[in-house]
Regions:
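Bacterial N-terminal signal peptides that target proteins for export
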Residues: 1-5
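Bacterial N-terminal signal peptides
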Residues: 6-14
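Boundary at the C-terminal end of the N-terminal hydrophobic targeting segment
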Residues: 16-19
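Charge-biased, low-complexity intrinsically disordered regions
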Residues: 21-70
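Metalloprotease/metallohydrolase-associated module, dominated by Zn2+-dependent proteases
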Residues: 43, 57-104, 158-218
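Short acidic, glycine/tyrosine-flanked loop/strand segments centered on an H-E-D-like triad
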Residues: 99-122, 126
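Short alpha-helix carrying the canonical HExxH Zn2+-binding catalytic motif
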Residues: 123-135
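Catalytic Zn2+-binding segment of zinc metalloproteases
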Residues: 134-151
Length: 218
């Protein structure tokens, strides 16, 4: 009788182990099917060349370079939106495995270049200032494009592994929180890179070069 009971227990344990292995295998397949994508949606630049030099300073962001031109200002508001879906599987013992898929959209909610009205009668000087602001425009676009390429990689590394939970609602809540945190961290790093690039453009050497070129204008 004891040997029969032991055999039954071993059989039950083997069945449970096989079920666990099958559950974990299905969960790993779920992770392999997860998708992390991002796109950059460009926005046309709005241009305004009718603002007086005296008024341009109020459009300059706090934290801008001390060398920031008062003849032109580039302003942009980056925007990001995320669509998160969580796929789950449940085991007979109540365990839940889950993996998120994520679609990210990077763009700009506003994008404008402001040039001093006083540059109007001086096309050579206006062109030099406009070229400088165009460098800032390029920084915004290039960094956001690169961010759209690289951020899905970072998000997959942080979120693409199978995670186990006690319920579907817990899985959805926790993974949403993790995704929000990871996205905030990546956006912060992207912003730091953008600011550093703008500071380089607004360097003392850059402004000295622009001033020398404007002195050479007719």
């Amino acid at each position: 009788m004891k040997s029969r009971l032991a055999l039954l227990l071993q059989l039950a344990s083997a069945i449970a182990g096989a079920a666990d292995n099958n559950f974990e295998a299905r969960c790993e397949k779920l992770a392999a099917e997860a998708k992390f994508t991002a796109v950059f949606e460009d926005k046309p630049v709005r241009r305004d060349d009718g603002i007086r030099i005296a008024d341009l300073a109020r459009f300059t962001r706090s934290g801008s370079s001390v060398n920031h031109s008062t003849l032109g200002v580039t302003r942009a508001e980056p925007a990001a939106s995320m669509v998160l879906s969580v796929r789950t599987l449940s085991n007979r013992d109540g365990r839940v495995c889950a993996v998120p898929s994520l679609q990210l959209k990077l763009g700009l909610s506003s994008f404008e270049v402001l040039l001093a009205r006083e540059l109007g009668p001086h096309p050579c000087r206006r062109r030099i200032v406009d070229e400088h602001e165009e460098e800032h425009v390029t920084v915004w676009r290039n960094h956001l494009r690169i961010g759209a390429r690289l951020m899905p990689v970072g998000l997959r590394q942080a979120l693409g592994q199978v995670a186990y939970f006690s319920s579907v609602s817990e899985a959805e809540s926790v993974l949403r929180q993790r995704a929000d945190q990871q996205l905030a961290s990546l956006l912060s790093k992207l912003k730091d890179g953008i600011n550093a690039a703008h500071q380089q453009i607004d360097s003392t050497a850059s402004y000295r070069d622009a001033e020398n070129r404007m002195r050479a204008c007719p």
